[in-house]
Amino acid sequence: MTVTDYLRREELCLAHAVPTAEGAIRIAIEETARTLHGASALVVGYGRIGMALAPRLRALGMQTKICARRCETRALAQMQGFSAVPVSALAQRAAAADVIFNRVPVLLLSETVLKALPPETLVIDLASRPGGTDFDAAKRLGTRVVWALALPPEVRRCHIPEKAVSAEFHRKNVEKSVESVLNSEKRLRNCEKATKTGIISSKEF
């Protein structure tokens, strides 16, 4: 039996990144007492969601910087016009940010980092459990943190359009998953047949 987790298909993950980014922006608008235009943003983690979020923040007029662990990820962010720093510079960059968006489910926003934040700084943690923020320390320090675990379902609840993850999209994604499995099994049978006969056709692979 072949088991396929269609929720891990890349096109579905990318589709979820857009409403998650839009939901994060909505939270930033609601939770800050100023316009996002002219404010500074730090995006921690530059995967699918980080890459969907950063250009949208920049389009709103935010001074957007990226913090990423891997040098090739930072190079990609720089190629796309963003200033990017390693995790070792997180505390320094975070202290200068008005809004911090975290997508890394590893404790990066530690008590040490949180202590460096101005009182008006907003942290929006988009990471899955256990999150990337020391929530206990944030509570003690009075740091404003929103752990947005409910996105993108929360986005749907607030009536922000999410056509990319509609029932129709899921239906098509399941069909693609089934087609992919069938094609893989066909290639495997052809390979076994070619091994037995010693005849390999380029059309079969």
Q: Language-model segments: what does each one mean?
A:
Residues V3, T64, A84:
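Hydrophobic anchor at the start of a short beta-strand
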Residues L60-Q80:
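NAD(P)-binding Rossmann-fold cofactor-contacting core
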